[in-house]
Structures are given as structure tokens and as C-alpha cells.
Amino acid sequence: MNIDLNADLGEGCASDSELLTLVSSANIACGFHAGDAQTMLTCVREALKNGVAIGAHPSFPDRDNFGRTAMVLPPETVYAQTLYQIGALGAIVQAQGGVMRHVKPHGMLYNQAAKDPHLAQAIAKAVHDYDPSLILVGLAGSELIRAGERHRLVTRQEVFADRGYQADGSLVPRMQPGALIHDEEQALAQTLDMVQAGRVKSVTGVWTTVTAQTVCIHGDGEYALAFARRLRAAFNARNIHVIA
């Protein structure tokens, strides 16, 4: 079987270049929560060198809190901001002779769009209007995935190696206990369950069905690089091929 392995990059982490040798897709910060024109250019060049699929990682305008602040913005504003960020990265990718493949929202924009159909609609419309061939990445089973499908976009349902899940398939909010998985063995077991069995055990002990088409490794995690190597080895041992 095949699985896509993605990481959020261009966010100021020293491990970006090494992670790009292990993942199949890169979600590059577009300046609203982290990064700038230079980091975008650097990440694009490194991704192209390693044959990694390139995607935009748009966010709410929130550099002070790394895009993790909840915001209530009109859908038209979210549409414009998303389009702006996709376009910025797209210009850099095109100038370097590459092709942008996907869009994955960041942080609170991602989380709110997973539940808010109006926000999800604004993001999906921005992606479609920029380039309807782009893939929209969102939380498995979320409103964002449904919005992408309504716009006839190709979607990729995402699961997280290092995040706790609630019984409804949503992520445990970062400020709550169980939101982050720090134990590598637990994260590895959870990932294999999601990829191979299509299920995840919630923090309440309930097993929930989940569709895993792409697995996220957070590039800003303390052990991201070591865990990425372990996960690749585990996939190889089970004849799971990492491919975008």
C-alpha cells in the first residue's frame, strides 16, 4: 500500500532540510504565521532538489501566536487571505521551475475549517479559483474535505502521528490534556493503526474510524527528525510505500 508523509516546513526549524529527505510532501509557511519570502524560496529549492511535492500552508494573520489564535473573520476575508498566500508561494514555485501540488491550512485556520462549513467553503473556493488541479488537504472526515469535494477538488484526508483524538474524530485542542503525544512508541502505534486498520483510539478509549491518505509529522516538534526516521523504517518493514 501507499501513504503520503507530510511535514509543515519553513517555520524556523533547523531540521527542515533533513526532513525533506524523509517526507514525500512539504507544506510551506506563507508568511502569515511564520516564514517570509526568503524561507519560502529556500524551502521550495530544497523540496525540488529532493523530489518532494510542494504545498502552500496558509494561516490566519497571527505571527505573534504562530497561527494558533482563534479568529472570527468574514468568509470573504478568509478567501482573500488564502488566495494571497497561495499566490505568493505559487509565484516562487513557478519561478524555480516547479509545480505546486496541494494546499493545507495551518493551525487554527485548519481546526476551525474542520468544523465551520462557511470557513471551509471560503478556503476551498480560494484553492479552486487559483488552480482547480490543486489538492486540498484537510482533517479526515472534516467540513474542509466536504467543501473540497463540493468544489470538485481532489482531496487528501489527513491524520496526525503526534496528536490526540476525540471520539468524534476531531483533534484534542492543544490546551487540553492528551492533545500532544510525546511518547514515540505511542505515536508510532497510533500511526500504524490509522494507516493499516483505518482506526484511531480516542483519549476516552473509544475506537473511531478514520481515513488516512496522508500522515503529518510536525516539523517544529522536538523529536520530529528521529521520529520521521523511525516511521519510515516501520513503513518499509510493512511494505508501506511513502509516495506523494
UniProtKB/Swiss-Prot annotation:
Pfam name, any one: LamB_YcsF
Keywords for the protein's UniProt record, in alphabetical order: ATP-binding, Hydrolase, Nucleotide-binding
Sections of the chain in a coiled coil: none
EC identifiers of the protein: 3.5.2.9
Swiss-Prot/TrEMBL catalytic activity: 5-oxo-L-proline + ATP + 2 H2O = L-glutamate + ADP + phosphate + H(+)
Top-rank EC class of the record's enzyme: hydrolase
Gene Ontology process terms (BP): carbohydrate metabolic process
Top-level lineage group: Bacteria
Alphabetical list of SUPFAM superfamilies matching this protein: Glycoside hydrolase/deacetylase
GO MF term set: 5-oxoprolinase (ATP-hydrolyzing) activity; ATP binding
Family of the protein in this entry: Belongs to the LamB/PxpA family.
Function recorded in the entry: Catalyzes the cleavage of 5-oxoproline to form L-glutamate coupled to the hydrolysis of ATP to ADP and inorganic phosphate.
NCBIfam families reported for this sequence: PRK05406.1-1, PRK05406.1-3, PRK05406.1-4, PRK05406.1-5
PANTHER family per record: 5-OXOPROLINASE SUBUNIT A, UNCHARACTERIZED PROTEIN YBGL-RELATED
Quaternary assembly: Forms a complex composed of PxpA, PxpB and PxpC.
Classification via HAMAP family: PxpA
Protein name from the UniProt record: 5-oxoprolinase subunit A
Gene: pxpA
